[in-house]
């Protein structure tokens, strides 16, 4: 394999044994593909597929007026261009969206003509609001903030069969039910009650007998019985009664008479139970009629009405039980044939028959009325209303839709072969569902498992947006229908009919405030990627936290390779929010699929198939780690496999599929934990969650021990700058990279220049710092997909969330008790865990009732010192170092007129109006904050004059744009002239500036000319003349194009900003705050080993080894055994080896050894100790040297999950680095110099600093704001509140008998209003006495009691 630009510079030693059959797919595909399908941008009318927006329009249009004389048809839509790009949207606080224009056709029919002749057709494009666009990283910019729409895992539409697990009835009897769930529309439930009758519920309302629904569908009692039951036919001949025998039906019954064959031989004696052997004998004997006594009929149910043969009178209705009286009537009427229902207690219960018996309705109309009463209680039913209501419930495409998925699941579940069909239900569907339910109750078939991933599907962004859009369109439809009747008479255009507000509102509401539209977690690249790959069971149409039981939250066998069993939040959402597995994707129906390799006759092929949970059940699937021989055949006698969702072993020839990779089980975050296989699952869960909280450090440091996934995450997350096309680096500085594209990648007629502007010191959603640093130098050759610049938490294109620290596992004076962490001062000095946080502070000047607020440096009652960081416009300058209380933006607000004294009136009259009628409302730095101003943005309303600061910012931005465009033009021009030079040199000229005819053109001659004069050359070859003309035209076109581009950007910058009503001006100030690590900060490793920094010790006091190297961190060894996350110990050992090898390479470089020696040593590291071999021969000597230089800090290792380094390989690495194979060494106490008595585990562990910083939590209060009713201090840091002295704390003081302290706590330090003001005054006067009064909460209590009508008085003694 060829190495990319960055891989060459630092190759990771890979310990994996298994081959890469399949690359890790693009990690954001689930978001991007879904939304791309929804928009279908760029598709022509013919190319539109029936999904997304197009499908939503088609489902609502055409809209036909109530009279039917006018119709509005949908033709197609197109998306416009966004007004601002992504960065401008974030800056201005607007939504990144495009206008949607829909072409509709208004058709008016001729009223007079009988065959609806068309009278008039009008076509027009109608604006239907803005549709938010997805950025290339799968996020949306809504009102200037980056948001993610999380995918939802919901119950698939279709039919489900279930039982209540015996919980409903006290007897513990299983009550079975069936539920038809549509994509939209009413739910239909069938359920058994304890008496075994079947009931139906519509939309979970009160239940009706199921036969009511069947009657409403038009079935008669007889048809219903025929559909569900077979019949026994009895013939009456005089005094004998013969049964038409179906021997199978007798099984399990007790013979009430002797059963004989044709010859009179007794096959079954009276009183014996009939078995399968007896039935075989009966079938052999060919007995077709069986004589039975008349009382055999008693208690049986009639299947067909019994009619008097002579008179035609009905003797007994069908579904009536035969009694002695009835039999007498039948005998009297000389009926010759009776049909009864065949039922038994084992596999054919009388459920439907019993249900019909409790059903009070007798015909279709009564049934419809009954359903109408249930759906609309209290309304008087009419025949039409009842029919319409029932028809609309399940049989109208407007109100009911199973969707393609629902129809597929429905048909598969009830055993049909075809998977396509109508979206509405049919009579047959309902009958089939009932049949299946009755079969399950009879013991044939099983109930469904609703947690099976074949019954849960993923709804992605596109689908949810489409549903919202349809909701908006349906609202529009109602309004349009009413207006269409006017369209005929008033000659309206389509534009006048459609009001786009409801559509825009529905979309806005979905993206702005839906439960699944979330503020993006932007702590670091991993948290971004994980957020976009999250799958939630919550949200509209999903579960709620309170209702979700254990089963839903649990890991299911079908999660394998689809949903990660490890990564899920701790707390109330556990198991409801999951993460997609690394290789998982959704299929066209929205079910999750996992990839497998095909195995044929125990030979593993490279063919890959994606299977959903349903399709995989019948396969026998081997693990990715199954042993193969050289030919790729399974060799073990028994292979560990998964079959029918169980783990078992099978012979190799039975295996049909094999896993693609061992990491296909886990999610991206879990696959970044090295030695995951040695960690307990609970700790791995914490490890994968805490990696998402790591704050990007000042200097990213790649993990010495990684898993090989780091590069994929960094590349796919979009925080790095990735080359769009290959080429040569033309110029590079801190803020941009310019690439001159290689000739073979340049499309004709475009500039072969790619300019990448880097993001510098920008605030993320979590207030961390986003900053990109270029990796390339001028003249470097890069290919498409190479990484040009690192983003936050990335190091040379690899994810780098923390720092490699030298750790020792030993107790240290109790400073690392209970997971505390003891740090060395060196960590702070080297800024290893220093992070930059950027805060955005906003000052808004509004128009108030008393006049406009003003942003100015002229603030009343403020000293000169407070204003020295402001410019003349009253805004702080960039680069100022500010602390709590400093003014950032000066602002004054007019205050209401107060009654003036005569003296003040006089002063006013003399010195003019404006002296004292304003108050200071400046923006100040909040408490506990100290930092540097790094940027200021000023937004001014249209029509309000811009201040000097706004103008200078605008000028700066214009200069930057101009510089970019000039650079682009310079390169285009340069490239064009280079191509011309290649063509012209050596060719003969006809004439030109200072040139004779027939002279050959040389390089020197061209160098002497100005570039503009080249086009005055006349060449002998006409093709060259044509090339010169084309080049001249091309260059002038480019110039024009770039000028237009500049003017467009300039117009955007100079137009006023769209601010909220009543706002005149907004100033945003960005503060950069540097936070060093300090006691109280939370740190963690990647194995769920978290702790709080307890102390920072001087370097000289830390334990050190025999060479005098001190450790950076001392961790408590007791944190390992009980937590069972041994992975951290293995990581420490391998980290030690990696660092040792780096030091060895460093010594070789310092001793200036030959390249061949270096190459040999690198070969030993990469290719002689297990794992994947690296092809070092393809690197030249200079590249080997560059690689060695980058390895001096340590050789990075990759130990992929479930396929990582073995113990012997770690030992071999330690040996190669000349370190003890135990990974332990003797340490000395830094304070005394004495050796500790036992060897200590020392090595390198990757530590993260989490976003739980003590600076954000530290808080103290003396006096402050009080709650209105109780007059007690508020709580919490945000309210500048106090600490609550609660019930238990009061008990503690009571227990000590500290009466005065307790009184102080409950009165003057809490809610005794007079007491506390008096106390404050006393302290100011130096008198430290207190007088406790009445606590306000006692007064509240008395008022509460009085409000109950109890008079209560306080008596004073």
UniProtKB/Swiss-Prot annotation:
Coiled coil: none
Catalytic activity: RNA(n) + a ribonucleoside 5'-triphosphate = RNA(n+1) + diphosphate
One GO CC annotation: DNA-directed RNA polymerase complex
Source organism of this protein record: Pseudomonas aeruginosa (strain ATCC 15692 / DSM 22644 / CIP 104116 / JCM 14847 / LMG 12228 / 1C / PRS 101 / PAO1)
A Pfam family recorded for this sequence: RNA_pol_Rpb2_7
Name this polypeptide is given: DNA-directed RNA polymerase subunit beta
Family statement drawn from the similarity comment of this UniProt entry: Belongs to the RNA polymerase beta chain family.
Gene: rpoB
This protein's record includes keyword Metal-binding: no
């Amino acid at each position: 394999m060829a190495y990319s630009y960055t891989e060459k510079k630092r190759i990771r030693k890979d310990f994996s044994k298994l081959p890469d059959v399949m690359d890790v797919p693009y990690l954001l595909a689930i978001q991007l593909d879904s939304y791309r399908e929804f928009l279908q941008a760029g598709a022509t009318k013919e190319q539109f597929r029936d999904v997304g927006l197009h499908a939503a329009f088609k489902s609502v249009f055409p809209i036909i007026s109530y009279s039917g004389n006018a119709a509005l048809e949908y033709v197609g839509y197109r998306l416009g261009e966004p007004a601002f790009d992504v960065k401008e949207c974030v800056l201005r606080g607007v939504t990144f969206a495009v206008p949607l224009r829909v072409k509709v056709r208004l058709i008016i029919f001729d009223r007079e003509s009988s065959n609806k002749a068309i009278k008039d057709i009008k076509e027009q494009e109608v604006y239907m609001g803005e549709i938010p666009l997805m950025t290339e990283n799968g996020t949306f910019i809504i009102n200037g903030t980056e948001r993610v729409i999380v995918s939802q895992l919901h119950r698939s539409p279709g039919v489900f069969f279930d039982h209540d697990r015996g919980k409903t009835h006290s007897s513990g009897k299983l009550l079975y039910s069936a539920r038809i769930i549509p994509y939209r529309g009413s739910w239909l439930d069938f359920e058994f009650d304890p008496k075994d009758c079947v009931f139906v519920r519509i939309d979970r309302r009160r239940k009706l007998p199921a036969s009511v629904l069947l009657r409403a569908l038009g079935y008669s009692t007889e048809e219903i019985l025929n559909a569900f039951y077979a019949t026994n036919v009895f013939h009456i001949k005089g005094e004998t009664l013969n049964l038409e025998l179906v021997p199978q039906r007798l099984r399990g019954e007790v013979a009430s008479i002797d059963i004989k064959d044709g010859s009179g031989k007794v096959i079954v004696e009276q009183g014996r139970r009939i078995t399968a052997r007896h039935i075989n004998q009966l079938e052999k004997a060919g007995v077709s009629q069986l004589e039975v006594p008349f009382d055999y009929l008693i208690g049986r149910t009639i299947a067909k009405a019994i009619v008097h043969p002579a008179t035609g009178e009905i003797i007994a209705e069908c579904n009536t039980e035969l009694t002695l009286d009835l039999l007498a009537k039948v005998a009297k009427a000389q009926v010759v044939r009776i049909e009864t229902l065949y039922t038994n207690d084992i596999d054919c219960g009388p459920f439907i028959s019993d249900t019909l018996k409790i059903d009070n309705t007798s015909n279709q109309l009564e049934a419809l009325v009954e359903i109408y009463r249930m759906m609309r209680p209290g309304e008087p039913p009419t025949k039409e209303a009842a029919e319409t209501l029932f028809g609309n419930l399940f049989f109208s495409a407007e109100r009911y839709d199973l969707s393609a998925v629902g129809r597929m699941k429905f048909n598969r579940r009830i055993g049909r072969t075809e998977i396509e069909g109508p979206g509405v239900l049919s009579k047959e569907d309902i009958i089939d569902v009932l049949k299946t339910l009755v079969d399950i109750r009879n013991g044939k078939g099983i109930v469904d498992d609703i947690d099976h991933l074949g019954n849960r599907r993923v709804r992605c962004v596109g689908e949810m947006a489409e549903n919202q859009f349809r909701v908006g369109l349906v609202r529009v439809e109602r309004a349009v229908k009413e207006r269409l009747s006017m369209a005929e008479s008033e000659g309206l255009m389509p534009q006048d009919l459609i009001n786009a507000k409801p559509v825009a509102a529905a979309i806005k509401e979905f993206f702005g405030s839906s439960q699944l539209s979330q503020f993006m977690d932007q702590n670091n690249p991993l948290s971004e990627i994980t957020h976009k790959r999250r799958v939630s069971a919550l949200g509209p149409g999903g579960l709620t936290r309170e209702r979700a039981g254990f089963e839903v939250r649990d890991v299911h066998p079908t999660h394998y390779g689809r949903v990660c069993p490890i990564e899920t939040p701790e707390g109330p959402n556990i198991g409801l929010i999951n993460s997609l597995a690394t290789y998982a994707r959704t299929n066209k129906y929205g079910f999750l699929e996992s990839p497998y390799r095909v195995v044929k006759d125990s030979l593993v092929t490279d063919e890959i198939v994606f299977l959903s949970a349903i399709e995989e059940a019948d396969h026998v699937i081997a693990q990715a780690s199954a042993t193969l021989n050289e030919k790729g055949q399974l060799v073990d006698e028994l292979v560990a496999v998964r079959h029918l969702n169980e783990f078992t072993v099978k012979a190799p020839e039975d295996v049909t599929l094999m896993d693609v990779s061992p990491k296909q089980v886990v999610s991206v975050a879990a696959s970044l934990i090295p030695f995951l296989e040695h960690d307990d699952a609970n700790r791995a869960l914490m490890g994968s969650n805490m990696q998402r909280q790591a704050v990007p450090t000042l200097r990213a440091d790649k993990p010495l021990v990684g898993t090989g996934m780091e590069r994929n995450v960094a590349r796919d997350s979009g925080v790095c700058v990735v080359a769009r096309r290959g080429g040569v680096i033309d110029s590079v500085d801190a803020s941009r990279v310019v690439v001159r594209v290689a000739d073979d990648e340049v499309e004709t007629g475009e500039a072969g220049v790619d300019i990448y502007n880097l993001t510098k010191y920008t605030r993320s959603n979590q207030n961390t710092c986003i900053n990109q640093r270029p990796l390339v130098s001028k003249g470097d050759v890069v290919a498409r997909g190479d990484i040009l610049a690192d983003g936050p938490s990335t190091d040379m294109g690899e994810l780098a969330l923390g720092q490699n620290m030298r750790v020792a596992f030993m107790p240290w004076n109790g400073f690392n008790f209970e997971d505390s962490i003891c740090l060395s001062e060196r960590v702070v000095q080297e800024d290893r865990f220093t992070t930059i946080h950027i805060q955005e502070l906003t000052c808004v000047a509004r128009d108030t009732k008393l006049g406009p607020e003003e942003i100015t440096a002229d603030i009343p009652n403020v000293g000169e010192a407070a204003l020295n960081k402001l410019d003349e416009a009253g805004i702080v300058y960039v680069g100022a170092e500010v602390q709590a209380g400093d003014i950032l933006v000066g602002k004054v607000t007019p205050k209401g007129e107060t009654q003036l004294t005569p003296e003040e009136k006089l002063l006013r009259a003399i010195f003019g109006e404006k002296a004292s009628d304003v108050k200071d409302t400046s923006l100040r730095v909040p408490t506990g904050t100290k930092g540097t101003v790094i940027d200021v943005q000023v937004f001014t309303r249209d029509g309000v004059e811009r201040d000097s600061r706004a103008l200078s910012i605008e000028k700066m931005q214009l200069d930057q744009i101009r510089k970019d465009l000039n650079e682009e033009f310079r390169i285009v021009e340069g490239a064009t002239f280079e191509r011309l030079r290649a063509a012209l040199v050596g060719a003969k000229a006809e004439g030109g500036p200072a040139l004779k005819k027939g002279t050959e053109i040389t390089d020197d001659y061209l160098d002497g000319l100005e570039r503009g004069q080249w086009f005055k050359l006349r060449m002998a070859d006409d093709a060259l003349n044509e090339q010169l003309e084309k080049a001249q035209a091309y260059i002038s076109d480019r110039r024009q194009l770039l000028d237009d581009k500049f003017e467009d950007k300039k117009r955007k910058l100079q137009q006023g900003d769209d601010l909220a009503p009543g706002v005149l001006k907004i100033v945003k100030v960005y503060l950069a705050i540097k936070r060093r690590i300090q006691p109280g900060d939370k740190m963690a490793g990647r194995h769920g080993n978290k702790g709080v920094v307890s102390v920072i010790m001087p370097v000289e006091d830390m334990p050190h080894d025999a060479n005098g190297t001190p450790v950076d961190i001392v961790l408590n060894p007791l944190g390992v055994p009980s937590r069972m996350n041994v992975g951290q110990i293995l990581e420490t050992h391998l980290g030690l080896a990696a660092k040792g090898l780096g030091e060895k390479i460093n010594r070789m470089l310092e001793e200036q050894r030959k390249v061949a020696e270096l190459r040999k040593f690198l070969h030993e590291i990469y290719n002689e100790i297990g794992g994947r071999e690296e092809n070092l021969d393809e690197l030249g000597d200079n590249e080997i040297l560059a690689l060695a230089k980058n390895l001096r800090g340590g050789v990075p290792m990759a130990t992929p999950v479930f396929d990582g380094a073995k113990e012997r390989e770690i030992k071999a690495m330690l040996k190669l680095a000349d370190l003890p194979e135990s990974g332990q060494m003797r340490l000395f106490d830094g304070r005394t110099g004495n050796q500790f008595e036992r060897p200590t585990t020392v090595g390198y562990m990757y530590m993260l600093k989490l976003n739980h910083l003590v600076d954000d939590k530290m808080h103290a209060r003396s006096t402050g704001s009080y709650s209105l009713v109780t007059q007690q201090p508020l709580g919490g840091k945000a309210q500048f509140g106090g600490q609550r002295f609660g019930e238990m704390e009061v008990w503690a003081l009571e227990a000590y008998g500290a009466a005065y302290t307790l009184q102080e706590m409950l009165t003057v330090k809490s809610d005794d209003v007079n007491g506390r003001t008096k106390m404050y005054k006393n302290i100011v006067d130096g008198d430290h006495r207190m007088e406790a009064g009445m606590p306000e909460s006692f007064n509240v209590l008395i008022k509460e009691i009085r409000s109950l009508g109890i008079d209560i008085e306080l008596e004073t003694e």
